[in-house]
Design a protein with these regions (language model features):
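Anion-binding and metal-coordination hotspots
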Residues: 4-6, 64, 72-83, 95-96, ...
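A ubiquitous short alpha-helical element
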Residues: 1, 46-50, 466
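Hydrophobic alpha-helical membrane-insertion signals
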Residues: 1-29
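Conserved active-site neighborhood of enzyme catalytic/cofactor-binding cores
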Residues: 91
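Basic, short loop/linker segments at the boundary and entry of helix-turn-helix/winged-helix-like folds
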Residues: 24-65
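Bromodomain acetyl-lysine reader domains
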Residues: 85-87
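Short, locally clustered residues in the helix-turn-helix/winged-helix DNA-binding domain
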Residues: 68
Length: 570
């Protein structure tokens, strides 16, 4: 007979577990130590002194980070983890927490501020322990779908179109009221706003009341019918049209315009989401979906800063993103792909931030090809005559300076150009023909000295030994973070609505990814430096004094930065 160990779930046991314990190298311990290193003046918020005491934010933050590290994003499932998973019980100290408490904490303004501050402390921790290399920030972006209905779009062009039609109908109604003898206290142009329509409705109501009074003073029977009753019928019809149709539509259009701001679209179920083209296009029709543009700054595949934007492209996000990074002074090199290369971004990074951009411009790779370098139609391949301020085309056509030009884009950035026009008198009649367009006009080119200066500077930086070495790390530094976010954590769509809530959730995701990666790296480092089967303790030393030892936009910074020291267990 085969022997088995005794197994009986109905057997009464006298053994009582009075404490929950987890291994010393467990990621839950690192999460707990990191959160405990954040000072109380950052963790705690001002609460009411009456009523039931609130749960400590440190406990809620630990629970949320550990749940996100285990790819659990539902409030009810986090509560289930708290009932079943021992590391979660250890973090919460076996405290019962409702799913509403978890969800309220995740969507609160305090959690948003708390996770932003946590990234500052994490960056300082990484730098103090020598885990930040080359003083470089690697920046990239990805798009995540919003928690919004797919066909809940509202388009700016549609609002403008329908509002123009409504203004035309309102003008016709205004003229009709004037023909009916209604005394109006505002002009026709004033009726193009909701406030103007409200005043127009009030004037119409007063005119209708005056007609009602006139009807009450008339005899009951009038031969041929009462003219006032016919007038009342016409004015009442106009009043109802204005009250039930024109005014609500105008108010809805103005409300939608306030929601849009500078965007071209938004979702009715998540007003902060913007419709964008996603990489995951399963229908292969370029379908637009509501989403957010997530920007992340990394070093060593650790996310050190992040933010979300409504811009579908990355070019316009770089400047506000860099302004939001409070530890930017720790880094000298800003590394990104060609999607961020623009004159405005180069001016901002070099002139205002005094940083080194390792960001190629859009034509950088193409300009390195032999075909582009040998093309006679590219002004960069022409011979510049500095003494006479002229360009000579390879075919011999001379272009002389004509005038200056300034262009301003819709965002307010100005670009200065020099216009060069082909001379009417060339050395030969053949060249004079080449100097003209098909329409018989003189050819001309626009030359941007500032842009060409930055192009040459970027080429020099990217081809230098240090610049090429740092830029070569970009693909293996920042892009794996998004791959891990989407493939390992399975996050291609956010789970909350509203910009603040989405920003907080993305922060929880990135911080949980950082801490789990850090725990694995520490475990590997310990295995490589210590004897097999030996445990290690991650010790975070924190001193509660506050000093400002370098300039950044946060108000506080630890005097003794956190340190990670692998120690042998006794």
């Amino acid at each position: 007979m085969t022997m088995y160990k005794e197994y009986n779930t109905n057997q009464l046991s006298l053994e009582l577990n009075l404490a929950y314990d987890i291994p010393m190298n467990h990621e839950a311990r690192l999460i707990s130590l990191f959160v405990d290193s954040i000072p109380n003046h950052v963790l705690l918020e001002e609460k009411s002194h009456t009523g039931r005491p609130a749960f400590h934010p440190a406990m809620l933050l630990k629970m949320t980070l550990f749940a996100y590290a285990r790819q659990v994003f539902s409030g009810r499932k986090i509560v289930q983890m708290n009932d079943e998973v021992i590391p979660m019980k250890w973090l919460s100290q076996d405290t019962y927490v409702s799913y509403k408490t978890i969800n309220n904490f995740r969507s609160s303004k305090h959690a948003n501020n708390l996770i932003k501050t946590a990234f500052i402390y994490f960056t300082l921790l990484m730098r103090e322990n020598g885990m930040i290399e080359d003083d470089a920030l690697f920046i990239d972006g990805t798009k995540l779908e919003a928690d919004a209905n797919l066909y809940s779009f509202t388009w700016k062009k549609a609002i403008n179109k329908y509002e123009d039609t409504l203004n035309g109908k309102t003008a016709e109604l205004y003229d009709t009221l004037v023909q009916e003898g209604v005394d109006l206290a505002l002009s026709k142009e004033d009726c193009e706003t909701s406030e103007g329509l409200v005043h127009l409705l009030e004037d119409t109501e007063q005119a209708l009341a005056a007609v009602e009074k006139a009807i009450s003073e008339e005899p009951k029977v009038i031969k041929g019918g009462s003219a006032n009753k016919q007038k009342r019928r016409r004015i009442k019809k106009l009043r109802n049209q204005l009250k039930k149709d024109y005014l609500p539509r105008k108010q809805r259009y103005e409300k939608n315009r306030d929601i849009l701001k500078e965007r071209n679209s938004f979702s009715k179920t998540d007003h902060d989401a913007t419709f964008m083209r996603m990489k995951e296009d399963h229908m292969m029709n370029g379908q637009l979906k509501p989403g957010y543009n997530v920007q992340a700054a990394t070093n060593g595949q650790y996310v050190l800063a992040y933010d979300i934007f409504s811009n579908p492209t990355d070019t316009r996000t770089l400047k506000p993103f860099l302004n939001s990074i409070q530890t930017l002074d720790l880094f000298q090199h800003i590394v990104a792909d060609a999607g961020y290369g623009s004159e405005e971004n180069y001016v901002f990074i070099i002139d205002e931030l005094a940083k080194t951009p390792l960001i190629p411009y859009g034509m950088y790779q193409k300009e390195l090809t032999r075909k582009y370098k040998n093309s006679p139609n590219n002004p960069c391949n022409w011979n510049y005559l500095e003494e006479t301020d002229q360009f000579m085309k390879p075919d011999g056509v001379i272009y002389s300076f004509k005038s200056y030009s300034r262009r301003c884009d819709k965002y307010g950035f100005q670009r200065d150009f020099k216009i060069y026009e082909a001379d009417k008198i060339q050395d030969t009649p053949e060249l004079e023909e080449l100097a003209k367009t098909e329409g018989g006009n003189q050819k001309h080119i626009y030359y941007n000295p500032t842009w060409n200066y930055f192009k040459e500077l970027i080429k020099e930086k990217l081809t230098s030994e240090e610049g090429s070495r740092i830029y070569a790390k970009r693909k293996t530094d920042v892009e794996p973070v998004f791959g891990r976010l989407k493939s390992v954590f399975g996050v291609r769509r956010v789970h909350v609505r509203g910009r603040q809530a989405v920003q907080t959730e993305i922060g929880f995701l990135f911080m949980s990814m950082n801490l789990t990666k850090l725990a694995k790296n520490l475990a590997l480092r310990t295995l490589n430096t210590q004897k097999p089967h030996s445990d290690f303790i991650v010790l975070i030393v924190f001193k509660a004094e506050i000093v400002v030892w370098f300039y950044f936009k946060a108000s506080f910074c630890p005097a003794s930065l956190p340190q990670l020291l692998p120690l042998e267990s006794p």
